[in-house]
């Protein structure tokens, strides 16, 4: 394998591992929200608001990972 191929494989591995955190966070957010709604259905508005806010923060981490991987791919020549 050439060094360029190895670098691209490393970038792909970094992206895969980097997106694992936000994916896990989204799963836990959804699980916790559904569990909270099951216990207290009247608090739907507050739970939904917090779920969307935390989901946006988790998505930001995924976007940062994507940007870093794109920059790393541009540097490889």
What are these regions (language model features)?
Residues 1-77:
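Hydrophobic, small-residue-rich transmembrane alpha-helices and their short perimembrane loops
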């Amino acid at each position: 394998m050439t060094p360029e191929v190895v670098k691209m494989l490393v970038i792909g591995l970094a992206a895969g591992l980097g997106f694992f955190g936000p994916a896990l966070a989204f799963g836990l957010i959804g699980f916790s929200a559904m569990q909270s709604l099951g216990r207290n259905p009247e608090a739907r508005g507050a739970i939904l608001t917090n779920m969307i806010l935390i989901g946006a923060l988790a998505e930001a981490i995924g976007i940062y990972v994507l940007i870093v991987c794109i920059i790393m791919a541009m540097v490889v020549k």
